[in-house]
Amino acid sequence: MTLRVVGNTTRDIFYLTQNFPAPGESVLAAERKEDVGGKGFNQAVAAVRAGANVCFTTAVGNDAPAAALRVAIDAVDGMVASVLTAPFRTDESVIMVSDDSENAIVSTAACARWLDVRSLAPTLAAVTHGDMLLMQGNMCHETTATVLRQARAGGATCVLNPAPLPQDAAALVALADIVVLNLFEACTILGREYANKDTNTITAAVSSGKMLQAQSGAVVLLTLGSKGCVILSDAEPIEIAAPRVVAVDTTGAGDTFTGWFCAGRMRGLSLEDAAREAVGAAALKVTRSGTGNALPSRAEYTEFVGG
């Protein structure tokens, strides 16, 4: 059985700042760093480091940064990758990280959106019963929807992390078996108000998660940052608390969670046990700065949880 991840790869440029600039304000960064990232890449690497058998399909540009991304992808032990060349500049993300470990991200997605059903035909042809397909929200709606339908028809369990939120995300959620998202994303899909992170409570998560689960029929995992996650299915809601840590950089925490959760399910873990491992791995990730290079390994996770 194989976890097949279809998604983006980006050149990540980090600016470490005391605070985010207000509209019209300029701020100086204390430091600039680069890493390899993108939700697709991060989730694929997270799953590999958790022990999954991963095939990753992505696209990069036809420019100099693409060469560095290809080297980074090839260097991931245990991951089989198909890296296509799009006729654009390589996708990149500019990530601001504040002193209180929060982040703000702006990304390009021309290469990710260039991927279509035709270019993904070999990936779909390789899907067999028992595989798992993992997608995100960077690609075109039509492509994402078609790939989810075809993979599901081929016997794969389809997992969707609809971030960044695509247009008509509700229609994509309905095509997935499992949906991983945060409370803001869930509220947006449902058309509910999300005031700020202070409303990021277990009660709000259970309420919104139940609505989304009933609307879509999918198992819903709502991530709540330092509060852990909530699982909504046909059974009673399951709440999983996160270990207490001192956060340095929350970038990639959701991707770590998603990759580790999928890896756990591929190993035969229950929803609860897979999510518990994923919450722990995400907590470890936020103690580190960066994206692809900061994703924890199985050995690091085991040491972290005291196993």
Predicted regions and their residues:
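Short beta-strand scaffold segments in enzyme catalytic cores
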Residues: 45, 92-96, 104, 228-232
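Conserved beta-alpha-beta core of the PfkB/ribokinase-like small-molecule kinase fold
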Residues: 132-204, 227-229
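Glycine-rich phosphate/adenosyl-contacting loop at the front of the ribokinase-like
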Residues: 1-59, 64-71, 246-248
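A glycine-rich helix N-cap at a beta->alpha junction
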Residues: 72-87
